[in-house]
Every structure is written in structure tokens, then in C-alpha cells.
Amino acid sequence: MDVLELLRASVNGCYNTLFSDAWSQYVSKQIATTTYWYGALLAIGALFIAWFLYFKRLASLRLRDESARTLSALTAASGGDHRGLRFRKRDKMLFYGRRMLRKMKNVSGQMYSSGKGYKRRAVMRFARRILQLQRENRPLEMKTVEPPAEYLEETIDGSDRVPPDALYMLQSIRIFGHFEKPIFLKLCKHTQLLQLMAGDYLFKITDPDDSVYIVQSGMINVYICNADGSTLSLKTVRKGESVTSLLSFIDVLSGNSSYYKTVTAKAMEKSVVIRLPMQAFEEVFNENPDVMIRVIQVIMIRLQRVLFTALRNYLGLNAELVQNHMRIKGSNPVPVTVPGPVLSQASQASRAMASRPATSPVTRMSREEHTLSDPDPNPNASAMLFAEVHGDAPYIDLYHHQQQQSSGVSVGGTHRSSGACTPTGSGGESPDGTGNATITNIDQRLVQSSAVDSLRRELGLSEEDTSIIEPFVEVRELEPNVTLITEGNAEDVCIWFVMTGTLAVYQSNADATRAAKQDSKNDMLIHFVHPGEIVGGLAMLTGEASAYTIRARSNSRIAYIRRAAIYQIMRQRPRIVLDLGNGVVRRLSPLVRQCDYALDWIFLESGRAVYRQDESSDSTYIVLSGRMRSVITHPGGKKEIVGEYGKGDLVGIVEMITETSRTTTVLAVRDSELAKLPEGLFNAIKLRYPIVVTRLISFLSHRFLGSMQTRGANASSAPVEANPVTHKYSTVALVPITDDVPITPFTYELYHSLCAIGPVLRLTSEVVRKQLGNNIFEAANEYRLTSWLAQQEDRNIITLYQCDSALSPWTQRCMRQADVVLIVGLGERSHMVGKFEREIDKLAMRTQKELVLLYPETTNARPANTLSWLNARPWVTKHHHVLCVKRIFTRKSQYRINDLYSRVLLSEPNMHSDFSRLARWLTGNSIGLVLGGGGARGAAHIGMLKAIQEAGIPIDMVGGVSIGALMGALWCSERNITTVTQKAREWSKKMTKWFLQLLDLTYPITSMFSGREFNKTIHDTFGDVSIEDLWIPYFTLTTDITASCHRIHTNGSLWRYVRSSMSLSGYMPPLCDPQDGHLLLDGGYVNNLPGHLWRYCRASMSIAGVFPPFCDYRDGHLLLDGCYTNNVPADVMHNLGAAHIIAIDVGSQDDTDLTNYGDDLSGWWLLYKKWNPFTSPVKVPDLPDIQSRLAYVSCVRQLEEVKNSDYCEYIRPPIDKYKTLAFGSFDEIRDVGYVFGKNYFDNMAKAGRLGRFNQWFNKEPPKRGNHASLNEYTFIDLAQIVCKLPETYALNAVDIFSEDEDFDGYISEPTTLNMDRHRIQVPRAGNSLSFSETELDSDVEIDLELERKVDKSTQSTPPTPNKKHPSTPTSSQGNLMHLPLSMKAKDKMQILDKLEREHKRRQKSKHKRDRSMQRDSKATLHPAPMAEATTQTPSSDVDIDAKLDQLRKLQQELEQGNESEQEQEQEQEQEQGHIQEPENVTEADTKN
């Protein structure tokens, strides 16, 4: 066919030619359909707009004409004068009526509350309707109140009231402990003022080191002199700081001359220095021995906690801290007092032991089981169990060996024996059958005499004092690798003197993992202890646990004295503390002495600043105890919290190394202790030990890596020393809002949940008084109380301070010690703030406060009115809703509460309870769930939630974006997978109703839909619920297009912010934030995993272009779908405090396999490729695709960071085949998510990776895992022991039922309570068990029952010891307490009064009791010492003893009758098979 004919035919309209192909048909069809629709819509729109404008114009013209006519009429009536205008009468009536009703508001409220006056109320309603009164029905909003100024600012007042010289003096000598005012004034008499000009030396090398220098004005520089003659600046001492060495202080007091060997000090400018000679302390110490001992103890604690902590944990120095004296071969290692025959016999015995065939390995007991003070009745089981963990290193149990090898008891309760240190089986024989005849041929008396004389000289005692020390010295023979004490053991602390052989001192690696620390093979060798040397003095003086593990390197003989014996010797000879301290100081290396001049121990009160912004950074700080807050001040003056630091954190290290000025101000949140490491000391150590540089590089790398993962894209804008706010607290104060709050059961429940994470301690005022004495809260005992509390905090991962219901000294102490304050209230009661709560806020202005609202488990409704609670308490930073079991709200006496929870603590806690969620939050182990956006694919979230629930993973926090915001909000609101599934299915069905969506269509200027019907579906799902009222903490993320950033919503209207997070661009308009008017879009545009609940859910679903942006009702900002910024906000969840995060991503994936089309691109070529079926297709994004990819740029980058993070478990179900709007496939998509999630978590469980989600664990377990009571490891005040001050009340089983008291075994995990098989049960007085009666007599009854058992124990005969287990104490040792006739009069009178009351009570109630009633099972308690009294009563001891004996006889007769009744009843119970264990005593068993 001719081409011209074809073209002519085409022009004439004949399309049956070459151009009549597929593409022309497609184009014509599309044009026709779209033209019709758009034409119709445009026509309808034009008509509507014209009609609207016409009527609006017509109405305005009518209004203008009417106004003109009215004005003209009034003008004519008043003669043309406008001043004659008056209000109409009806307007006046409306005005005065409304005014009257405002005045009568209170009266009307009373009428409504009284229920009377129906006619009056009817009149009021009629008047309100006539007067057109309208109530504002605005939702309750969260008051955005800035924290008080004290929260972010330091305290500056208070220092001007003290003269500068006295203030600096007080601050400088505080390192020696607490001094009373008379002692301080005596020290001030010896001070001297030194005037120094610039360049003058304060001291030089070879000058005596015998003074404390305090800079009053000016500046002093301390230098260190190297061997080559060069000098290096060690630190700069400014006004108020001091130059001293505590190690030289001990040298001076010990009588040793001390000189400056490598340190000099020079004045940099004109300075005034206060000089305090160290000899001034000697005068004070002679008059007050207790002050001397306390100062030595403080110095040793500073040495261990400051010097060793800084140099070992942060600089990686271990062996460099101690001198390792090497012995010359052939020298005589044994003291010259040992005769020659003894040496030869000892060497023969050693060779015999070395050549003896190896026996079975000696197992050692674990640090949890082994104690010297409380022997285990079955040591072999625990030893075998520990041997599997700690390898083959044998361990010697000195106590058990002592019990098996010796039958004589010395004066101190210790056994004098020199038998071989080999394990014994039954019958006292060794496993190889050779017995204990290894050194029987050695003269025991000479060896013992040599040991006594050696230890006497080491302790600085004279020959006349031999009789004092001789009863306590013990000698042992050790085989190689025998362990004397393990690191962290506090019970087996002794003073060891090496007679022959060598001991090796080890320490665990600070960087080792948890498993590596438990393996003794990974311990680092510190130094050797050779013959003639002593070890163990540091732990003896500090009273803390041993910092080292000591093992025998070879066959050795040691002489040792136990801790209790040392303290008895110390009472008679207090100055032995100087010799013990001097022995510790002699062992230290010169590096430690140089560091002692530079390192400072700083005490900061709450509100004081460590350093300020823009100051020079010349030092770094180590937080020893307390809490610090870092605050940055912006150029406009606004302050913002950058981070918080807790115990063990390093503050200011980055700024010091980079030599930049301080970027933030760091202040103390509560009373804190810090170690100051100057830059000069850091440089000196760095030059001498290059390994320090490697250590710091590793430390800083981990810090920056964590900061990058935490802050993500905002890392560049954060300060250099930024540390995100951590939610891991070490001390928690519990404050009841009102008296009816069950604070004691609440503390028990929280303690029960915390025990599953690690060792926890619960402290009350009663516990502290019984442990430290009734006068412990006085000012004179400040040091003892502070040191004891600090030691308890070091032992436990968290300490609970239960406050009193009044502003007592104990409550004030709790506020000073707390890292966070939990304000506990009843959620269903009034939200009003009481006077006590306001006083609490004044006491701890800088401490973070969190509100805990309790609800009974029987409640069916979700929490409500939370906003009222929060608005009334602007100081609260976070709130928790806790659902409580029934036993918490049951009214019981303190005795019954303690008895109830003694059984509860034996069970495992419910890890899914709200108490467990709160426990994980406090310890920094919260588990977060992040749900990403993806439209209809979000139905997979429901299946994943079910799989998570079946895997046993608790959910502590939930965050979501877009559809994930909707599903997450449903879970936080219901917490029931069935209800959540039902509501999600109903919402998905509504989204499939196309006729509702057609009615929601609008002119597409901002979006295709108006969003009205979409809002209604979300509002119907949630109702008017606020985010604050959800059971689980929840947040959603939206895109704020007004401020061009993402916004995190943790409070406000739920449905609105969910709607905002689902506002996808182009489909719905952005949501306008009512707070600030900002426009919010879907949060997935910036981050796709993260008032009234529905509003923010709606805001999070505002898809741009589909739904309009949602306007925030708070500020007016426009909110869109959060997927534009962050579609999986796991980083936001991590910043909010979640430690372990599960992130579920259901978003669509972009195609990255695109065609490379070269340097230029022709649209015609793409059109040809697309419409030509005979060519290969190309993958080039079109314009809408490019716009979409640009919108999701930040989201994709954020998602990659989440995938590579170590805190997040990223999960993506296989739902790519489902479209974004396929809401009709809800059940199918849900099943896909469930099957995938179930298989995924099953594989994680098999691989061992599920434990961090569904099993509680302790990242840093304590050195000892079994703390049965506070007595096992407690603060030891040497001054109290030496000076025989009033002794403390030991916590034992006797005190467990006193008010607000703990149980024996209550301090550790609940499983340790299984060891306490015997508890006392005492019947109540009276016959009624009504809770309305006063039950304060329970504690008195327990005391009476205890005295009855005491009287019985004193009259009984001790049974024969158990031969099979020689270590088991006899009954004479296990009595409750002894009442010797030489007892002090006051104690006897107290017991006598109790016995008289018990005797009278029994005589009165004997004829009333029914003998057929079942009696309670009774048990004995563990042995416990009775506290001594310090005063004498005027009563005669003889009369008291006679009367006491008489009452004992009467009591014994009563007991014989009671025992016979009890035996008969037990026989009857055995016949019926109803005998129960003491642990299973129920509440009904307490009936009398």
C-alpha cells in the first residue's frame, strides 16, 4: 500500500490502517474515562462554589443594610448624638443572668451533690437554656511545665557564711573522715600561713613530707621529677584545694621518716598556703583512739576505692601497683627465732609432701557457700558443685578443716592445730588413707611459738603482749594451688604470715566477661608473698571484701589470725592498726605514691557543680557513688539535659584528651563521691606505661560507637561529652502519697521481682536501727551511716529505701541517697497533692521522680484521669500503671504481712507482671517492641504479637508508626491478643467499604480524601483515650511538616496521633497539631520503627495525598505519616530506655536493580521501550517514584542503622506479595506473620539467642551470689570495736517479725530462703481474726515466745555432736541465746519483765483455751548473739538472779505441759497424714 494513501486515510478519519494498534486504543480509552470523571467533578465543583459565593455575598449585603438602618434610627432618636446609645433590655438580662450564675456556681454544686432541690435544679437548667450558656468541652490537656530552675542549675549559696580559711580547711581534712568540732578546733591551732611569691618552692626533693598544704589563694603547680632530670607537671592546685599524701600520713604516724623523693611544688603566682603539720593529728589521736582508727580506715578505703579503681579499671594497671620483692636464693626466709632442728624437720616434711603420690583432687567451696562464721552442715555437696565451674584448683576450707582436725577450742573460738591441710572424709581420715601424720614428727610447740612471735612483731606488739595474741594464732600446711580466699569473699578475711613457701596473689581481669571472671584460669598474677611477709591487711582494715584471690604457689606453711580475733586484739592494743596500715603501704609501688599526690577524693553535696560550661578541661572524674547530671546552656539561655552519669562512669575524659573547653555543666543530683584524675598525672602514666593508651582507645571507641548507635543522625550536633540519659538506677526511694497506700506490700512485691535480676536490698528505718543502733540517725554517726549505706549499695545492683509515712530523719536520708524517687499512690483515689508530698519535692528537687499508680486486679476498666495526677505534679517525669494482686490490698498487721511474703518469696516471680516490668525499667533491662508501617501488611503485627506472647517474651514498651501505631496502641490498651485481633479485624473491614471512601472524596488540592470517615474509624476503635491512660508505655512517631522534623508523642490524644502517623502524603491531609499548629505527616518519612489516644494514632496514619495532614490540637502543627522520617523507630525506643528491642518491619521494599541508561535519558526512548512488546523492558524510576524515594531517603538510612545495631533484633515477615491497601486479606496476612514469628523464635531458642528476651539475667553478677542476711557482709566500724561503743543490733531471725523488718535470707534471691527451714509461728492473743481489730500485739507475742524458748534452751542439756558431719554445731552452740548469771543487770531486768508478762498471760488464758483446738507448729531459730547493753541499773544482781531462777522453774513446768500436749497433737496429725512443713503455714494456722 502507498504510504501517501495511508496518511490521507488517517487524516480523513479512517483508522483501519497501520495506526489502529494497541497503544492508540489504550490511550483513547484512558483519555475518555478520565475526561468524563474530571469534567463531571469540575462542573459539580464549579456549581457548588458559585452557589456558595452567591449566598455569602447576599448575606453580607443584607447585614450591611440592616446595620445601616439601625444606626440611622438610633441617630435620629438621640438627635444625631451617638452618645445616647443604650443596650437593649434582653441583652442586659443575658449579661446579668450569666454573671449571677457564675457567682452561684458553688451553690449549684452543693445542690447537685446533696441530691435535694429538684425544682431548683430544673430552674437552673431552664435558665441556662434561655440564657444560651454553653460549656466548653475541650479535652483535658497535659500542662507543659518546665522543670524548676534547681533541676538544671547548681547551688551557689551557703558558702559565704563560713570564712574562706575555715571552709578550705574543712574541705581538705574531710578526706580523713568526720571530725567533731572540738577536734577540728584543736587542729586549727597548729595551722601556719605561708606567703609564697611566684617561683617560690612550697617543697622540694629531700624536704620532709610531714604536712598537709591547703591553698587559700593563688595557684600551686606540683611537678614530678624523672630520672633524667626533666620535670613533668602532675597537677595544678587552685584555691581551696590541697596537696597531701595519705600514704605519707601513715608513715609519719608510724614513726617512719618520710621525704619527698620525686615530687616538688612551686608557686605559679603570689599565693597564700595553709600548712597543717601531720604531728598535730598525733596529739588528737592520743586523746581519742577511736578517731585515729577511723582515720586509718578511711585512708585504706580511699586507697582501695579511689587509687586502685582509677588505675586498674580505667587505666589497665594491675601488677604495676604493687612491689614484687624477689628473694635471693640461699637467704634465710624464716625468722631467726626458729631453732635449727625445726628447719630441718620442716624441710624434710615438705619434701615428703612433694614426693607423695597425688591423691584425688581437693574440691573447694564456692564463694557463695563457703563461710568461716556459718559452717555448712554438708560441705561436700556444695564443694563438688563448685568444682565443676572453677576447675581443678583445690580449695581449703579452714573452718571445716579446723572442726575435723582439732577438738580443743581456744579463747577466741578458734582452734590451735598444725595438722596437714588435706580434706577429710568420714571418720576424719584423708582420702588416701594416710591420715594426718604428715608432720607429726615436727615439734608443734616450736612452730607455734615461732608463728606467734612473728605475727607479734608484724603487729607491732611487745613481748609482754604475747599472751594477748597467742590464743588466736593458727598454723596450716598448704599444698600447691590451694586457695586461701577468693576475690569478693568477705567472711574468710584473715591476716596471713608466710613461714615457708610462697603465696601468689591474683586478681580478675577488669575487662573479662562474666564467664571469664568465674574461671580462675583467667585471673591475672599481681605479686608473690615470700617467707617473712604478711598479706591481708587491706581487707582487714577496710572491713570490705577481699580484692584479691590468694593461692599457695608451692608447699607452704602459713600462720594466720582471723578477722574476729584481730578485732579483739585491737580492743586492747588500738595502735596495731598503724602497723597493719604501714604493712600495706610498704607493699605499694612508687607509682601509687606519686598518684596519691595527684588523685583527689571529692565529696559533692546535691546541687554542687563538678565543672561548668566553657571552663578549661584539665582533669577527668570517676563517679564512685551518687549520680551526676550533664546540662548544656544554649546561646538563648535555655538549658537542656544532655545525659546522666552513675556509679563507675567516667566524666569529662573526651574533653580532657582533646584539650577542648567544657561543653556542658555537670552537677551532682544527690550527695556523691568522685575521684579526680588530673591531666598531668594522666600524661605521666601514659609516658611510662604505653598500655594505658591502648586501654583508653578501647574505652573511647566503645563510647563513641554507643553514642553513634544511640543518637544516629543527630550525633554530630550533640556535645562531645554527651552521654544519653540512662535509666539504670542503683538506689530507689519509695514514698507513699497517703497513709492508706500499702507501701510495705508494694516494696515486697517489687523486691520479689528484682530478685530475679540480681541481689537486691530492702532497707527501712527499723532495719537500719536494728543493724546500727537506735541513735544511728544522729549527727555524730553520720560517717558510720554513710559508709554502711555506701557498702550496701556496692554489694547490690539496686537498693530499695522504703520511706516512712512522715518526714522523719530516715525519710530525709532516703531522699539524699536516692537516684530516683517512686511516688506510690492509688489510681482510683483522689489526685490531690498532700503536704507531705510537697515536702518531699523540696527535699529532692534535682532527683528524678516517677509516679506509680496502683490498681486492683479485679478492675475491668483501663486507667483514667491520669492527666489530673500528672498536672497536679509537674515535678513527675514519668508514670507507671501497676496492676496488683489481691494480697497487696488485704488489710493485715505487719507480722502477717511479713509471714505472708516469707512464703511468696519462695516462688518464682511472674515476669509478665507489671511489677516485673517496673523492675526491668529500674535496672535498665526493659524490652521494647517496635512496629513499623506498611498499610494492610500491618496485620502481620497481630500474628507476631501472638508468637511473641507464646515465646514468653515480656513487652515493657511499645512504639509504632503508621499501621504499627494502630496495632501497638491496641496492644497497650487491651493486653489481650484475642481482643486486639477482634478490634483490628473490625477496623480492617471498615477500610474495605468503598462507598464510605467515595463519600470522603474531595477536590485534590491537599489530598484525595477529606479524612472525616478515616478519623471516625480510628475514633470508634479507641474512643477518647489518652496515651497517658495506657497500661504499657507507648509512643508514636509522626512527620512534622511545619518544623520539618519527626515528632515523638508520648502523651496526648491517642486516636489523633495515630491518625497523624497514618497520613500518607497525597491521600490524606496532614494533621494539625493543636499544641503549636504544626502540620504532622506519617512518621515513616523519617523513621519507620519507633492528649487522646486516637488523635495521635490518626496523625501517625496521615498518608500524604490520601488523607489531609492532621492538625495537632495543642500547638497547631501539621502531622503526617511517620514513615516519611522513620518507619522503624528502634533508635527512638533505645533512647527512651529500652535495652533490648524487637523491631518488626512490614514496609514495602524499593527495587534497587535499575537500568544503567548512560549520561542522558530520552523520554521518547522510555516510551518506546515501555509500549513496544518486542523489546527488552527497562527499569527506570518515573517521576512519582523519584518523589517517593526522595521522601523516604532519611527513612532508608535510619533503617540500615537499625539493622546494624547490637541492641535491636530486626525481623521482617515474608509479606511482600501483599499490597498496601489489601485490607481484605487481614486473616491471611495475620497467619503469615504468626507462622513466621513462631518459627523465628523457635530457631532463636535453639540457637540460645532468646535468653536476653524471655530470661532475666544479671550482666555484672556480684562477687557473692548468696546473701543470707545483712550480717554476712556489713560495714565494720573499727573505731566502735576498739572503743567499745554501744554495739550494733545484729540482724537475725529473731528480728524478722518486727515492724518493717526483713527475713533471714530476704536480701538475696528468693531461692536462698530454702536454707531457712525453721521459723517461729506465734498465736495471736484473743480469739478473733477480724482485720478491724488492732493487731499490734503480734510483735510482743513473738518476744514472749522467744523468751520462753530461751528459758527452755538454758535449762536443756546439749546433745551429742553429729559424728557424720563434725562441722554441724551442737545444740549448745545453736541455742537462741545464753543467759549467764554474770549478765548485766539491765538485760536481766528486760528479760525478767518479759517473762513475767508471759507468765501472767498464760495463767489468764489457760482456762479459756480449748484443748481440742489444733495448735501451731513451732520451730527454733538460728543462733544469734544478743546485743550488749552499755548502762547498769541500780537493781541488785543477786535479787534478780534469784527471781529469775524462780520464774524459770515456773516456766519450765508450763513448758512440760505444753510439750506433752504438742506431742499428742502431732501424733494425731501423723495418723491423719496432715503434717505440714513450717514453710507451708497458712493464715488460718495462726488461730490461738
From Swiss-Prot:
**Compositional bias ranges of the Basic residues kind:** 1399-1410
Where does this protein have compositionally biased stretches of type Acidic residues?
1456-1470
Q: Where in the cell is it found?
A: Endoplasmic reticulum membrane
Give every PNPLA domain span. 929-1095
**Where do we find the motif GXSXG here?**
960-964
Job of this protein: Phospholipase B that deacylates intracellular phosphatidylcholine (PtdCho), generating glycerophosphocholine (GroPtdCho). This deacylation occurs at both sn-2 and sn-1 positions of PtdCho. Its specific chemical modification by certain organophosphorus (OP) compounds leads to distal axonopathy. Plays a role in the signaling mechanism between neurons and glia that regulates glia wrapping during development of the adult brain. Essential for membrane lipid homeostasis and cell survival in both neurons and glia of the adult brain.
Q: Under what name is this protein listed? A: Neuropathy target esterase sws
Organism expressing this protein natively: Drosophila mojavensis (Fruit fly)
